[in-house]
Amino acid sequence: MYLTRKLKLGKTDQLDRLARRAGNLWSTVAKWHWRFVDRQGYWLSKGQAQKMHCKGVDGLHSQSAQAVADSFYDSLQSWRKKRDSGDYEGLRPPYKQKRYFKVQWKSAAIKLRDDGVLRLSNGRGNDPVLIDWPSDTKPKRVEIGWDGSQYKLRCQYEVEEDQEPKGTKTAGIDIGEIHLAAVYTGDDSWTFNGRELRSLRRQQNRTAARLDSKIDRKEYGSRRWKRLVQAKDRQLGKIRSQIKDLLHKHSTRLVKTLHERRVGTVVVGDLTGIRNGLDYGSKANQRLHQWAYGEFVRMIEYKARLHGMTVKRVGEAYTSQECPSCGNRHKPHGREYICSCGFEGHRDLVGASNIRKKYLGQDSVRVAGEMASPTGVRYRPHMRCNPASSRKAACQWQGCRPVG
């Protein structure tokens, strides 16, 4: 299994030169690909483009040059799939020239020296990129790109799923907006409060609207216009980081709690396609399209696998409407689910219970009587889910700088 780490590198002349060379190569690959299409009606393959343009590129490792062509053709292939499926309205193929582009290094160009310095080769006769490395693990792949204010390194490294699940329990998880996750294991239940995430989304929308109104009143390209655009990018980037931090901390807390409670299988409601064909009004649509359920579920999945747990997805159809006790269906009103059979329970926990039951089979034991109140988990900005040693390592990752 591969994980990704990120390092902030600042801005250096060497990284500017590398990004410029990668941008020039991207522009060359794109220009000649579309020239062949327009003049000869022929689509170059990735291998043909690499033979034509990626050999002996000055200042770039051969595999870094090949990775630029890979990126172009991956983007092109993605567009062609969208076109073939008919779902490509407003999408255009990659054709624009790029002044700068991300630089990628594959395993053969990466070396971790004994003195703790990561060496990224740029080919024979060129100065390598040297970075103080806060880990004794060599990454399999490294990518350096511009994030709007500085260069950021992203690396992939292999980790072993060496932890075994402590038990064989099955947990059902219902993903929501007011409650980011409702979890039911049959014995225990929790709800993870999502109101802080909603607050950050509102702040994000207000900030974007406020700055957009100021930007629209300035002359395009003027000094004041540029400053406002930079301020918008900076402020929205900070909010995006806060949202990602919240999702990481909640998902880590959730998975560790399940591992401690001897859960071996995690069943998550599949919300794929939930946005398709829905129209609840402008504000509700905005909340729905900003709902980060996909990213949150992906975090749960890979963190659960690291703890040896199996993750499954099942459809969520009618899981919030079906009574866990008698099986009758009706739409609940408010946050409590009340059935005519006498069953009462938290609305989101009813969904989590039915997701779990759907995976285990319809003949599993039904919930009788009243469902116990769940344990609530609320986000705090200072909440930490890792031990002190891990926090120290995380700080080291954030503080890395290039050598020299």
How should each PLM-predicted stretch be described?
Residues 153-164, 237-259:
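Phosphate-interacting basic helix/loop segments used at nucleotide- and nucleic-acid interfaces
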Residues 179-230:
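Metal-dependent catalytic core segments for phosphate chemistry
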Residues 13, 160, 285-287, 291-404:
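Positively charged, low-complexity nucleic-acid-binding target-recognition regions
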Residues 165-185, 300, 348:
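Gly/Thr-rich phosphate-binding beta-strand-loop-beta motif of the actin/hexokinase/Hsp70
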Residues 150-169, 330, 335-338:
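A short acidic-Thr-Gly-centered motif at the start of a beta-strand
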Residues 1-67:
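Gly/serine-rich nucleotide phosphate-binding loop at the start of the catalytic core
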Residues 45-147, 286, 290:
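Acidic carboxylate diad motif detector
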